[in-house]
Amino acid sequence: MSLEEQYRTDANLNARIALHARFSTNPGWSQWLFDHEAPPSGARLLEVGCGPATTLWGANLERIDPSWKLTLADFSPGMIEAARDLLGDRADYVVADAQELPFDDGSFDVVLANHMLYHVPDRPRAFAEIRRVLVAGGVFHASTNGEGHLQEMGDLTADWWPFERHIDAFGLESGPPQLEPFFTDVRIERFDTGLRVTEVEPVLAYLRSSERYDGRDLAGERAAVAAAIERDGSFWVTTTPGLISCRKP
C-alpha cells in the first residue's frame, strides 16, 4: 500500500490512534503535547501533516486560543476534510506537501510537524521549507518516537514482516542531527507512557491498518496476544513518544 493510499482517509490512522487512546498507561499525551506546543496569544501557527487533527486539536478544543491564526496543512485531501469537519472555522485548511509549502517567507511564528516527518521522502527539503516560512526566531516543534517504540509489535510480526522502524528515518535520537544544519537550540523532551492492552482485537486492528499488511488472517498474532492477556492480565507494548523543538536562527 502506498503512502497516498494509506492516508487517503483517516481510517487507518484512527485505528492506530485508538490503540494508544484506549490503553495508554499515561492518557495525558494530547494535553502534554498541547502544553509544549501552544504559542503565545496572537501567534501565526502552521501544522504540516495535520492528519485528522484529533490528537492535538480535537482533544483540546476548548483550549484553542481564538487569537491564534491557525493553518492546517496535509498532502491528503481526505485528511484535510476530516480536520475541517472537526475544527470548522477555528483554522484555515490547505492541501500541501511539506516539501513545497505554498506560503510566503516568514509567514508563521510557530510550525508543528507531529509524528509525520519519518514519512517525508526529502526531509532536508522539508526542513528548508519550514525554516523559510518561519519568522526569524520562530519555533519548530516535531513530535516523534524514540528507541524501543512498539518493539513488542515487531516481535509479533517478526516471522513475516519486520516492523517499520520509523525512528531510523526521524526519531528522538536520529532527528536532532538532521535538524541542526537548519535550526538552533535543538532540544528533546520525552513523555513517559506505555500500552497495557487488555483486548486482542485492537492490536489486530492496529496491524491491519499498516501499509505493509497483506491480508493474512493474523491467527498466530491473535493467539500470542490472547496468551499474554491470559497469563499477565494484559499485553504490554513499549511506547516512547516525545518532542523535538528548535528555532530558526
Language-model features: locations:
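A short acidic, Gly/Pro-enriched loop at the edge of an enzyme's catalytic core
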Residues: 99-110
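Conserved class I S-adenosyl-L-methionine
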Residues: 1-41, 54-58, 62, 79, 139-166
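Conserved Class I S-adenosyl-L-methionine
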Residues: 3, 20, 26, 52, ...
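A short SAM/SAH-binding and catalytic strip from SAM-dependent methyltransferases
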Residues: 109-122
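Short glycine-centered segments of the SAM/dcSAM-binding site in methyltransferase folds
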Residues: 44, 137-139
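A short glycine-rich, Lys/Arg-flanked "PGG" loop and its adjoining helix->strand segment in the class I
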Residues: 124-136
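Class I SAM-dependent methyltransferase SAM/SAH-binding core
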Residues: 44-100
